């Protein structure tokens, strides 16, 4: 009996951040264990502030990253935009995944930020830079993120993003229940 060979599918990740890339790889491999993927990280503009400060702006940043990734590499099977943001005293991220026919979206869990961090963000710094300054770390945003610091490494940026990405993949893992929406 011959084994069905599946064509490799290309996933373009609109980021060069290792934590984001690892989360995308992990989620796709978990959701589609029989599928072979080629993952490509690219840098594209979000067209929002470096540190989005509302839920709406953060969501728009993830959508824009997907749009710009499609323009940059128009022949991929999937495009993934991830955008972290802040609203009030919490930080979170939006995940947007698109194919030619479908879009899936999800927002990650939110975590409270310390008052000292929030006060320094008023100076328009990125959260990762402020966390490095307050906690004495270096480049935390490309490692475990603020969440690893605040949960004593019980959770990481990648682990939280992984869950949100699995949720954003629902239209793709359940195609019979989700008609084309693009």
UniProtKB/Swiss-Prot annotation:
Question: How cofactor binds (record note)?
Answer: Binds 1 divalent metal cation per subunit; can use either Mg(2+) or Mn(2+).
Instruction: Indicate whether Nucleotide-binding appears among the record's keywords.
Output: yes
Its EC number is: 3.6.1.73
- Gene Ontology process terms (BP): nucleotide metabolic process; thiamine metabolic process
Q: Name one Pfam family in it.
A: NTPase_I-T
Query: What keywords were assigned to this record?
Result: Hydrolase, Magnesium, Manganese, Metal-binding, Nucleotide metabolism, Nucleotide-binding
Instruction: Say yes or no: keyword tRNA processing present.
Output: no
Name the cofactor(s): Mg(2+); Mn(2+)
Query: What's a single GO MF annotation on this record?
Result: ribonucleoside triphosphate phosphatase activity
Catalyses: XTP + H2O = XDP + phosphate + H(+); ITP + H2O = IDP + phosphate + H(+)
Q: Which SUPFAM superfamilies match?
A: ITPase-like
- Family label: Belongs to the YjjX NTPase family.
> Which PANTHER family does this UniProt record tie to the protein?
NON-CANONICAL PURINE NTP PHOSPHATASE_PRRC1 DOMAIN-CONTAINING PROTEIN, PTHR34699
**Subunit record text:** Homodimer.
Q: What does this protein do?
A: Phosphatase that hydrolyzes non-canonical purine nucleotides such as XTP and ITP to their respective diphosphate derivatives. Probably excludes non-canonical purines from DNA/RNA precursor pool, thus preventing their incorporation into DNA/RNA and avoiding chromosomal lesions.
**NCBIfam families, per this entry?**
inosine/xanthosine triphosphatase, PRK05074.1
Q: What is this protein called?
A: Inosine/xanthosine triphosphatase
Q: Which organism is it from?
A: Vibrio parahaemolyticus serotype O3:K6 (strain RIMD 2210633)
- Origin organism lineage: Bacteria, Pseudomonadati, Pseudomonadota, Gammaproteobacteria, Vibrionales
């Amino acid at each position: 009996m011959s084994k069905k060979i599946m064509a490799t599918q290309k996933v373009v990740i609109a980021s060069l951040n290792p934590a984001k890339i690892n989360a995308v790889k992990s989620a796709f491999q978990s959701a589609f264990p029989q599928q072979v993927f080629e993952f490509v990280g690219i840098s594209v503009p979000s067209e929002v502030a470096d540190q989005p400060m509302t839920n709406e702006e953060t969501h728009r940043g993830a959508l824009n990253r997907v749009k710009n990734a499609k323009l940059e590499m128009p022949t991929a099977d999937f495009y993934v935009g991830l955008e972290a943001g802040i609203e009030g005293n919490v930080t979170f991220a939006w995940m947007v995944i698109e194919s030619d026919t479908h879009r899936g979206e999800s927002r990650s869990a939110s975590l409270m930020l310390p008052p000292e961090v929030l006060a320094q963000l008023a100076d328009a710094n990125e959260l990762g830079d402020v966390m490095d300054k307050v906690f004495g770390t270096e480049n935390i945003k490309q490692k475990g993120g603020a969440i690893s610091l605040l949960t004593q490494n019980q959770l990481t940026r990648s682990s939280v993003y992984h869950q949100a990405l699995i949720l954003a993949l629902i239209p793709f893992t359940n195609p019979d229940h989700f008609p084309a929406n693009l």
